[in-house]
């Protein structure tokens, strides 16, 4: 007796019109995550995962490439409007926002959510090179 063929169900992509782009720009890398309004991740990309290694990873161009890759990953969800949350002091802050704008998203607002301590932990000592 032959088994009936099992049909693999096609994964249905939900359509999202508004999204939130979380940009984490550290001194060493830039991480771009695009979520829906509830915070469910739709796609992400990093400068390191985009092929940049070492000191090239911490450049504005690497952050731009990461933003373009993240934008390509979430195009199939139908996102048109993006709210941008930027965290961190890194070099990829502005170039990431420009790349998302150039990718065809309408940026509704930009918020800086960098955590600022109320004199919390002691910072690391200064480097002596």
Swiss-Prot record:
- Tell me which species this is from: Salmonella typhi
Q: Does the keyword DNA repair apply?
A: no
Family according to the record: Belongs to the universal ribosomal protein uS11 family.
Q: What does this protein do?
A: Located on the platform of the 30S subunit, it bridges several disparate RNA helices of the 16S rRNA. Forms part of the Shine-Dalgarno cleft in the 70S ribosome.
What keywords tag this UniProt record?
Ribonucleoprotein, Ribosomal protein, RNA-binding, rRNA-binding
Q: By its UniProt entry, which InterPro entries does this protein fall under? A: Ribosomal_uS11, Ribosomal_uS11_bac-type, Ribosomal_uS11_CS, Ribosomal_uS11_sf
- Report the GO molecular function annotations: rRNA binding; structural constituent of ribosome
> Partners and quaternary state?
Part of the 30S ribosomal subunit. Interacts with proteins S7 and S18. Binds to IF-3.
Q: Which domain of life is it from?
A: Bacteria
**Entry's Gene Ontology cellular component terms:** ribonucleoprotein complex; ribosome
Q: What is this protein called?
A: Small ribosomal subunit protein uS11
| Gene designation per UniProt | rpsK
What processes in GO biological process is this protein linked to? translation
């Amino acid at each position: 007796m032959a088994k009936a063929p099992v049909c693999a169900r096609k994964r249905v992509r939900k359509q999202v019109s508004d999204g939130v782009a979380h940009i984490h720009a550290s001194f060493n890398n830039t991480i771009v995550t695009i979520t829906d309004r509830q915070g469910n991740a739709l796609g992400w990309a990093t400068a390191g995962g985009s092929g940049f290694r070492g000191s090239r990873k911490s450049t504005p161009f690497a952050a731009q490439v990461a933003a373009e890759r993240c934008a390509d990953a979430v195009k199939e969800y139908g996102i048109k409007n993006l709210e941008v949350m930027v965290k961190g002091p890194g070099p990829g802050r502005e170039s990431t926002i420009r790349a998302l704008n150039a990718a065809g998203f309408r940026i509704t607002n930009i918020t800086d959510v960098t955590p600022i301590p109320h004199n919390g932990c002691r910072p690391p000592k200064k480097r002596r090179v």
